[in-house]
Amino acid sequence: MAAAFSHVIFDLDGTILNTLEDLAAAGNHTCEAHGWPTFAVDEYRYKVGNGMLKLVERFMPAEYAGDGRMFEQTLAEFRAYYGEHKEDHTGPYAGTIEMLDRLRAAGVQLAVLTNKDHVSAAPLIEKYFGSERFALVQGRVDAFPPKPEAPVTLHVMEELGADPATTLYVGDSNVDILTGHNAGLKSAGVSWGFRGRAELEAAGADYVVDTQEELAALILGE
């Protein structure tokens, strides 16, 4: 039986890789360097998801809102630290590699589309998933507005030769659900990520799954 979806585009952070601890460590290191308040790791679940610029904006004290010079300095410091430490605690969610291999064996084409800077996203995918599992990896670049705006998703689909009717976007946050819908795709939310089932359902997810096995069955039409 043919798979229900011929192409699947995955978010990265909170969907296939658990990057939260390293993102939080980089944010708190940057805050500590300035004598600013730091945050619990779990608080970063709601600071990530819209790219590094938004993440930095969210952990900077409110008194620096609108201070472009301080923002650029803080962003550079965060990027430098994260670039050196992005693999300290990061790893794939249990069952993810097996799920991806099952999908590929069934002929499903896989891609990654993330708001993480491309210079960080591409090496992480290479390290943890190799170069063969994903046909395309697209991180944040200046040429496109970030998710959930449609242009970057449409670009990925064009590169893949994907049909919207048989393409699924998979992620762990409201941003991801909107990313799929804004490009005319169905969106599946994964409850094991940073945000959880309630946010995904409120965002209008077409599907919400709790395990990698459940996601594979959905994609394969089982």
Question: Can you describe what each PLM-predicted range is?
Answer:
Residues A2-E98, R104-A106, V119, S131:
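N-terminal helical cap/lid subdomain that shapes the substrate entry/recognition surface
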Residues M1-H7, R104, H118, A122-E222:
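Asp-based, Mg2+/Mn2+-dependent phosphohydrolase catalytic module
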Residues D11, T19, V48, V112-L113, ...:
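Small/polar loops that bind or transfer phosphate-bearing groups
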Residues D13, T30, E77-D88, A111, ...:
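Hydrophobic, well-ordered secondary-structure segments
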Residues I16, P92, L110-L113, Y169-V170, ...:
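Conserved SAM-binding loop
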